[in-house]
Amino acid sequence: MESKFKQLSDTEQELEISFSPDEFQPELDKQYKLAQAKAHLKGFRKGKAPLQMIKKMLGRDIQYQVVEELAGKNFESVAKENDLKLVGQAKIRHYELAENEKLSIYLIYEVHPAFELKPFNEYEFKKAEYQVSDETVEKELKKLLQSKGNMVAVEGAAAPTDIVIGDVQKLDADGTAIVGERQENQSFRLEYMKDDSPFFTALNGVNKGEERRVEVEVKEEDVPEENKKQTFLISVKEIKRMELPELTDELVKELSRGKNETVQDFRDELRKQIEAYFTNKSEEDLMESVAQKFLEENVFTAPSSLIKMYEDMLLDNAKRQIGGAFPPGFDETYYRAEIRPNAEKHARWMLIRNKIAELNGIEVSDDDIKALAEKEAKLTGAEATEEFVNTYFSEQYKPYVIDTLLRDKIYEFIKANTKIEVESKLPEAAV
């Protein structure tokens, strides 16, 4: 058996495997005879049809079966001997057969692209250290209390947290009401509007019975220039405000489902949750910056099959977020095209991480897996630690565990070998 490689692109190769007659002909003859023994051909008893007729009628199928078997048996060993870093499965491109002389099988497959990782020890990143204030805790507490509150109509000027209800009339350039462009009883929740929003500016402080004119600039490119500026007249009919209940020990027990007994315990627990959220956010934001920097500095082509794998993952995630399936008529082809750049980034970042691990001897040991299993068992309060360990070492779960641990180790290595500036920051929004 001989093998010959041909580079088709940065990520695609062709392998030609050639066999001598003694390596393929015996198996080919065997399959011809097996087909002859099973054949029911008109004019012949079972198994008595001439071999040449069998070859003429079934030869191509039999040959391809033998080619597939030989390719399957030998490709893995050739790939291992030549240290091929495969992505996905190899495919038979075509084959050339001269019986009793030579068989050549041509396979195409994808490999990890060859690239030199740029030095990164001088990379600089900023990491936010969020300061959770009493004010932040109170804001989140208020959000939780809203589930037990009641909306009540109020007199006086609308506060920045109120809901303004009114009729909206669209006006033309001359200020005249446009027929058919009136919407009644529209709700404007000021709390969720930006401070510089035209609607917030107009309605904050408004009173029941007053009118406010709002000018909005449409930014969509497909809107004609003459329609870029739109004017609305809002007639305020009612102002509603959330009336919150008093936070008591009894309400705390209900909100926490019995986990907390007192108001102070509840506040302390809420602060811990907010701090944990922002600690995690800080880490995720840093890792996003790290990935972006490495992608900018290391430009190469990712294998198409790897990109498709991430496309499929992003597609499945999108489906899960809307109940498991896209609505009828959804253009999946268009959506794939939209998410492909993101999938390509995921693929390239995975290859960069693997390169970092390879160059720096970063590996995951069985002790690492066992330690994680024991840690998770302890966190969940599970008594059967051994069951956790067995699950983490199972054939189904182990690859996922290794990938998670390896990714974490690589991140820690990057953080230890780059410059990270910690900056104090106030939370913009909490959990």
UniProtKB/Swiss-Prot annotation:
Catalytic class of the enzyme: isomerase
Pfam families documented for this protein: Trigger_C (PF05698), Trigger_N (PF05697)
PPIase FKBP-type domain segment(s): 161-245
MF terms (GO), sorted A to Z: peptidyl-prolyl cis-trans isomerase activity; protein folding chaperone; ribosome binding
Catalysis performed (reactions): [protein]-peptidylproline (omega=180) = [protein]-peptidylproline (omega=0)
Family to which the UniProt record says this protein belongs: Belongs to the FKBP-type PPIase family. Tig subfamily.
Domain commentary: Consists of 3 domains; the N-terminus binds the ribosome, the middle domain has PPIase activity, while the C-terminus has intrinsic chaperone activity on its own.
Protein name: Trigger factor
Source organism of the structure: Chloroherpeton thalassium (strain ATCC 35110 / GB-78)
